[in-house]
């Protein structure tokens, strides 16, 4: 493991030095081109002009699918955090609240349970519940509104998300019919 000082050192120079230290400066070097910005690759290529850079995106993607037991447990924990946070936010829902109130309860619960961050928070209610990937607004919740909430909890760069749907009070007839068809 090599560490570079963020904002004070060039990570590509550190990587080039590591590759050289391993004796690979004239060999094949697998690069995740779909992730590495072009400007960074150009720096790396200039620092290692004799290296044969090859696309290794598929290899990295395949390796990410393999999880250690510790990684699997962390993903389970993150899923539980996300699920519990959504449950806590739904428990707090009452007519007259706003979507922002739901978001506040959601994020508070995520952090209280030990997550370091969250990603892709969706809070959509009423007519907005049909829209994809929308964040919370100051829309006021009404009796019978459908609430769609999704959040990804994050620890050490690992993400796990959960999406749930509920209603404010009793659901409208159409929502109950859709639910009945889904569980049939």
Please give the residue ranges for each predicted region.
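Active-site neighborhoods and metal-handling regions in enzymes and metal-associated proteins
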Residues: 1-184
């Amino acid at each position: 493991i090599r560490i570079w000082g963020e904002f004070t050192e060039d990570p590509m120079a550190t990587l080039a030095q590591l590759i050289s230290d391993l004796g690979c400066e004239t060999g094949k070097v697998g690069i995740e081109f779909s992730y590495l910005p072009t400007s960074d690759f150009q720096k790396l290529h200039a620092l290692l002009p004799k290296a044969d850079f090859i696309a290794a995106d598929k290899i990295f993607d395949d390796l990410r699918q393999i999880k250690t037991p510790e990684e699997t447990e962390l993903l389970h924990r993150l899923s539980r955090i996300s699920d519990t946070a959504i449950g806590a936010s739904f428990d707090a829902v009452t007519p007259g609240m706003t979507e922002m109130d739901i978001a506040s309860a959601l994020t508070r619960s995520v952090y209280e349970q030990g997550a370091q961050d969250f990603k892709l928070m969706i809070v959509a209610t009423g007519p907005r519940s049909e829209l994809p990937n929308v964040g919370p607004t100051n829309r006021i919740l009404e009796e019978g509104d459908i609430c769609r909430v999704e959040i990804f909890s994050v620890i050490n760069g690992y993400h796990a998300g959960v999406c749930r749907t509920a209603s404010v009070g009793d659901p409208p007839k159409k929502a109950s019919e859709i639910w009945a068809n889904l569980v049939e």
